[in-house]
Amino acid sequence: MADNQGTEEEGTGCNGWFFVEAIVERKTGDIISDDEPEDVEDSGLDMVDFIDNSVSQVEGQENPQALLHAQQLQADVEAVQQLKRKYIGSPYVSPVANSEPCVEKDLSPRLGAISLGRRSAKAKRRLFDKAQPPPNGHTDVEAAVEVNTEGTDETETDQVQTVSGETTTDSLGRQQITELIHNTNIRVALFGMFKDLYGLSFMDLARPFKSDKTVCTDWVIAAFGIYHGITDGFKTLLEPHCLYGHIQWLTCRWGMVLLLLTRFKCGKNRLTVSKCLGMLLNIPETQMLIDPPKLRTPAAALYWYRQGLSNASEIFGTPPEWLARQTVIEYSLADSQFDLSKMVQWAYDHNYIDDSIIALEYAKLADIDENAAAFLGSNCQAKYVKDCGTMCRHYIRAQKMQMTMSQWIKHRCDLVEEEGEWKEIVRFLRYQHVDFISFMIALKQFLQGIPKHNCILLYGPPDTGKSNFAMSLISFLGGVVLSYVNSSSHFWLEPLADAKIAMLDDATTQCWNYMDIYMRNALDGNPMCFDRKHRAMVQTKCPPLIVTSNINASTDDRWRYLHSRVKCFCFPNRFPFDSNGNPVYDLSNKNWKSFFKRSWSRLALNDNDNEEEENGDPSNTFRCVPGKASRPI
């Protein structure tokens, strides 16, 4: 037993040991009696007592059967241990042992498990679990059966026994998907498979979005490993979500492959699209490539157009305008060159004078406006934006300078669409104990720019609503705000050159000293010279000026030369708020609009130009775009 190496034949057939106990009466060299002839036929009667069936054993007598059984049991244990080390992974070996072999662990897992450092007690999350039995009850049985028959040494091995036909197909599908998942970079594998199937890169049709939160209506999707039964009804499932769909199906070793160009009914980000299609296709999000299409690449548009003509594609809905513009001849002929005058007219109509706002808002019109699309296709966008903003500022400034105060107030009233309540303004003035008649007289002279009445001072304790009242009036009339913090610059009064009304908030002692020394002529309402940065100085009349302060300049002897130039109103009470923190008196644009309409005649704002417009004479609307000749009837 000890001489036989290996245990390949143990436990696999009927080749066990049996024990024979015999009594030997003769030894080598004994003389055989002649009374026992050798040719006598053996009848078996002399073998009756050959096997000892007695149960009782003499105490202390050696039992060879028990000894042999113990030796065989020890050999079996050693053989099983060798098989376990050969075919079963040791629980003490790390999962990375396959990539980083270790001699000590291979020789002895227990020795490899010994560590001086403290190991983390946290369980490591396994990214990919081994194949588990499917929920339908079908399993794959792998068995190795070795049969050793008498008279032959051949070994028959059955590798895999499949329980059902469905299990074989599902197993192959799971094996292919597992192969895809276990790739080092899944996205690279998907890109490679897409290029092998379609002959072009996925990024030739789509543009990358780095953020998964960016919203878009048009998307290009490539999905892999789809079950073939979904292909028939996918179009029906997709139609409720989309306005347009271009569907292509191909097959590969991973299953069905979908290439989809779609326009959703509302904007979606990449996460929302992946969840929606993952639910419809019954695949994980990692098996999809999702990016928006290239909108300005003729080659990409031509690909979708040519594929739509073949019978390999299913199309529903109206094609997007960017696709039709690059493939339909009618749209191609309609493309025209960029016209700056149209852009300037658009900015003037919307009262856009900031370059950044002009650039952003006009770029949004590229899908519906031909001139905006030509603007995006130009290499001089920055120059066009700068020129457009400059021209708009020139037009608006010239138009403002030509208007009288009554025309300007009417223009500002027309910009407010809502109707308010003029009593809110009157109630606030009464709450501050301001004589309404005196205030209306001062406001009338203030708006007309009469000398010595060109400045109104609102003074009082803090938190009485002085700045809120003045800011609301300046906001409605479209005025400018000056800050004394810029008084060290020669250009801090430059905004007064283009304003109809101005405000100086929170004038301190230093500010009043500056006004007493340098701005007496401005408070009179007489023409004065303003220095402008990088431009020549301009001479113009100072617009009406509202000043808020905690100091009453009309009673301080330090500024006695300003007493006759400033009309003062005191706000003694704190500005009230309700329980929700909202102001009790709403000083909004709609209420100021109602106030000026109600007090139009009291403020002497009637003008001949306004009367002509009220009598039916239309005003000339500014147009910087040449008109088109109408067809004869």
Swiss-Prot record:
Region (Disordered): 148-168, 609-633
Residue span(s) of domain SF3 helicase: 434-584
Protein residues bound to ATP: G460, P461, P462, D463, T464, G465, K466, S467
Ranges annotated as biased composition (Polar residues): 158-168
Ubl conjugation in keyword set: yes
Main location class: host cell
Family, per entry: Belongs to the papillomaviridae E1 protein family.
Known partners and oligomeric status: Can form hexamers. Interacts with E2 protein; this interaction increases E1 DNA binding specificity. Interacts with host DNA polymerase subunit POLA2. Interacts with host single stranded DNA-binding protein RPA1. Interacts with host TOP1; this interaction stimulates the enzymatic activity of TOP1.
Its job: ATP-dependent DNA 3'-5' helicase required for initiation of viral DNA replication. It forms a complex with the viral E2 protein. The E1-E2 complex binds to the replication origin which contains binding sites for both proteins. During the initial step, a dimer of E1 interacts with a dimer of protein E2 leading to a complex that binds the viral origin of replication with high specificity. Then, a second dimer of E1 displaces the E2 dimer in an ATP-dependent manner to form the E1 tetramer.
Protein name: Replication protein E1
Gene: E1
